[in-house]
């Protein structure tokens, strides 16, 4: 099994590591999340200069043509620094939809602008009643002449307040939970009929409730084919789930390492608490959970993501297993730090909150375990032996 990075991946890893080290020390991050904007535009410009915004995009549009392993490298390091800029919403989620469904005109006009940092996008798909079901869409789009008129409500749209454009899912035909009949629309966030209510989330990131009232959208702003967006949405959300899992693995490493160091330095009754055998066992269990989380992340990254059956199974297996690791490592870190683990001034509680949020993002452990079991029992996907183990 060869898990070594290629030379290009090593350079990418070193570059992102250097960015986090130089621009995301703890005090700097605290100032960023406490600001009114909740992110730093200078960092976004630096992402563009470093080429990070172009990692997953095709070279034909100015991107680097990176794969899932390259996104894993970026997101894992972002997790270690708790980077709050909207990389996942813009580059991976919305950018992935544009790459997958966009016309040549749309891709040529939007993707280079994302790569240069001039455009930020967010994907508005979740609704109050939908939970994790991507097909549950009540927001409607009715054709009226050359325009569609959209009405509805979208919940917890990450990065919307920082975005210049939204991609909105709406139902153009069919029943509320039908997979067919869902269409995507690209809209400017300043459009009349669109209202954003922005707020900080528990993990200090930013999200928005999006109110859509008689929003007129030209037929030219339809992304992909009318009524046929569901399969692409599921695919890009799966790829985004792997990216979120990568971020979680970076967070778990920080929690594991910082807790081990704290236990070595914390003195009780004249000796380090790390000499206590019960604590040693807990630290070893944290390490095991982290290593298993990283291993199953590699499994998902190296799966054939173009094969929808294999992709679904690999993604749900990884999300369910990493969700379990998040719970154990996160809770253990808080417990072993004692009172220090819950104070806002110390980093551990912030890493725990972000990890917990990732645990429910794109589906929690129970959801993905059920999805995985359904796929397995249905005979969907090939055997585990067909999954490549090479990171490259």
Roles of regions detected by a PLM:
Residues 213-231:
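Long, acidic (Asp/Glu-rich), low-complexity accessory segments flanking structured domains
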Residues 1-85, 101-106, 113, 117-118, ...:
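Alpha-helical interface subdomain recognition
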Residues 151-195:
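A short core secondary-structure module
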Residues 136-138, 156, 188-219:
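Flexible, small-/acidic-enriched active-site or ligand-binding loops
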Residues 110-112, 129, 138-140, 154-158, ...:
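A generic local secondary-structure boundary/capping motif
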Residues 100-102, 142, 168-171, 186-188, ...:
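Short beta-strand-to-turn element immediately C-terminal to the catalytic PLP-Schiff-base lysine
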Residues 51, 74-79, 170, 187-191, ...:
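Short Ser/Thr-interspersed hydrophobic loop/turn segments at strand-loop and sheet-helix junctions
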Residues 117-126, 168:
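A short, Trp-centered hydrophobic/proline-enriched beta-strand micro-motif
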């Amino acid at each position: 099994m060869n898990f070594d990075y290629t030379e290009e991946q090593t350079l990418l890893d070193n570059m992102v590591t250097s960015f986090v080290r130089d621009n995301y020390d703890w005090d700097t991050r605290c100032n960023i999340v406490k600001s009114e904007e909740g992110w730093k535009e200078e960092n976004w410009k630096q992402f563009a200069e470093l080429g990070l915004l172009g990692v997953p995009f095709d070279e034909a549009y100015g991107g680097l043509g990176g794969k899932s392993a390259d996104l894993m490298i970026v997101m894992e390091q972002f997790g270690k620094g708790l980077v709050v800029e909207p990389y996942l919403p813009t580059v991976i989620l919305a950018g992935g939809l544009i790459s997958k469904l966009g016309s040549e005109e749309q891709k040529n006009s939007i993707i280079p602008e994302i790569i240069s940092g001039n455009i930020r996008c967010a994907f508005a798909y979740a609704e109050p009643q939908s939970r994790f079901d991507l097909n549950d869409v009540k927001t409607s789009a009715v054709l009226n002449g050359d325009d569609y008129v959209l009405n509805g409500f979208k919940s917890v749209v990450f990065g919307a307040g920082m975005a210049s454009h939204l991609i909105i899912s709406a139902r153009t035909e069919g029943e509320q939970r039908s997979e067919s009949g869902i269409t995507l629309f690209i809209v400017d966030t300043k459009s009349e009929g669109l209202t954003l209510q922005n707020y900080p989330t528990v993990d200090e990131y930013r999200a928005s409730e999006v109110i859509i009232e008689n929003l007129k959208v030209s037929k030219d702003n339809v992304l992909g084919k009318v009524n046929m967006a569901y399969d692409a949405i599921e695919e890009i959300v799966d790829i985004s789930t792997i990216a979120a899992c990568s971020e979680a693995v970076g967070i778990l490493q920080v929690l594991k390492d910082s807790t081990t160091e704290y236990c070595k330095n914390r003195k009780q009754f004249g000796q380090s608490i790390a000499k206590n055998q019960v604590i040693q066992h807990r630290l070893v269990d944290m390490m095991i959970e982290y290593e298993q989380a990283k291993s199953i992340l590699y499994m998902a990254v190296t799966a054939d993501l173009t094969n929808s059956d294999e992709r679904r199974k690999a993604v749900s297996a990884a999300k369910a297993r990493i969700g379990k690791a998040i719970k154990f490592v996160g809770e253990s870190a808080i417990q072993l730090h004692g009172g220090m683990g819950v104070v806002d001034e110390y980093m551990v509680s912030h890493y725990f909150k972000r990890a917990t949020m990732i645990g429910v993002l794109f589906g929690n452990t129970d959801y993905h375990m059920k999805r995985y079991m359904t796929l397995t029992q249905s005979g969907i996907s090939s055997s585990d032996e067909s999954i490549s183990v090479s990171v490259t």
